[in-house]
Amino acid sequence: MEIPYGAGSRITYQWLPLLLALLAVSLYGRFLFQHALNAPYHDDILDVINLILNVNDSAGLGSIAEAFFAQHNDHRTLASRLIYYVSYRIQGEINFKTLSFIANLALPILALFFFTQINDTRNRWLIFLPVVFMMFQLRTYGVTEWAMAAFAFFYVYVYGVAALFCLHTVTKLRFFAAVVFAFMSTYSIASGQAIWLIGLLCLLHQSYVMRQIPHYYSIAWGVITLLVLAVYRSELETPNTLLTLIKYALATPLKHTQYFLGMLGSAVSFEVLYIAQFVGVLLLIILLWQTIAHYRKGYSKVEYTCWFIVVSAATVALGRTPYSEIQYSQTSRYSFASILLVVCVWLMITNRYRIARSHLLIATAASATVCGASYWFYTPKFDVLMEERVAEFNRGNYHVFGQKPAHTNALVADAISKGIYTPPPRPLAIPATE
């Protein structure tokens, strides 16, 4: 039975969810503030410190552009580097606390995007509350305080979602904005290249199925896609070519499938692989069902976002499966895509179907349980990670995987001597969880 509307229900179903949402965001922010370290971690050294050193030592615009566009592992991180540099110029030095805070702003930005997509105005806050509980949990603990990784794994979706929002019911101005956002998504992390495929499908569907926009949008997007990806791959040195990765996938299809499904369902698995894979299958079934059912009726921005998340996760699985065990799909850095997919599938269902308030309350309770349990389950793992970071910092060691310690230590020492980075006094205390 539907719960009746009234003055009392307005407090219960509008103001109370708003207060609970603010509480969840505040707790996450407090946790972030308590544990923030102004100390570089792994890729921070090569992607942040090395960038500022190279830009400051550059002789002209050409070498500056080269520093911003330079390859980092299999990625190009221009979008993140622009923010690093602006932050550095404003503060006068690199501050990794500041960068971590800016990186985590991706969460409220995405949450606001999703809030605007809720159709049920009377139950809007009750529908939105599970979104907040899912997004502001501790599942991504491994990248929460790791500036470079947080920018890459969080903002690839900020830019990608913004691009899709612009392409939906596209105009010339929105098309231009979508190209810019898609470019930024691509230059956040390699998986952001998936936005060009989903963007093309979005335009083709609007043009040839719904007949809402001219065909030239699809053609223009396709041409720009080829140009951007050609530039991206120009002088890109990597053994992980697309052809090589496809050969790996064809050789071990079961492992790749298990890895991919594990990633998709990792948001609520608490690192139990078979639970993650089950949830991944369930999410895919729901998404496929809705996609087929509404092919002629049209898709919302949320549905296109779902497919961007799925395809970007597939590219990550394609690149990581050959070099790691299936259980590695439960690593915290790869869970953000799953969190967003759960959120978007939830919004898709609540927009398509009228959900009784009693069922919304059940979903709210379930998401609140996941959020609370994430702090209980992942805080000890987070504390171990922070202990290792502090111990490494206090020893004066700046380790980066695949790099000689003498090289990375020299980069940090050079940044310190030039006033680019000022480390906190040693010994640095381990941040305590209160």
Describe the predicted segments one by one.
Residues 4-8, 12-128, 170-173, 191, ...:
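Intrinsically disordered, polar/acidic, low-complexity terminal segments
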Residues 24, 128-135, 180, 222-226, ...:
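Transmembrane alpha-helix segments characteristic
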Residues 43, 122-170, 187-192, 309-349:
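Membrane-interface micro-motifs in multi-pass membrane enzymes
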Residues 87-90, 116, 136-146, 230-240, ...:
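Juxtamembrane "helix-exit" motif on the non-cytosolic side of transmembrane helices
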Residues 109, 157-168, 196-199, 262, ...:
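Hydrophobic cores of alpha-helical transmembrane segments in multi-pass inner/ER membrane proteins
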Residues 174-202:
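Membrane-interface alpha helices of multi-pass inner-membrane proteins
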Residues 181, 313-392:
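Active-site/pore-lining binding-face segments in mid-to-C-terminal subdomains
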Residues 250, 254-264, 321-328:
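Membrane-interface interhelical loops and short amphipathic "cap" helices
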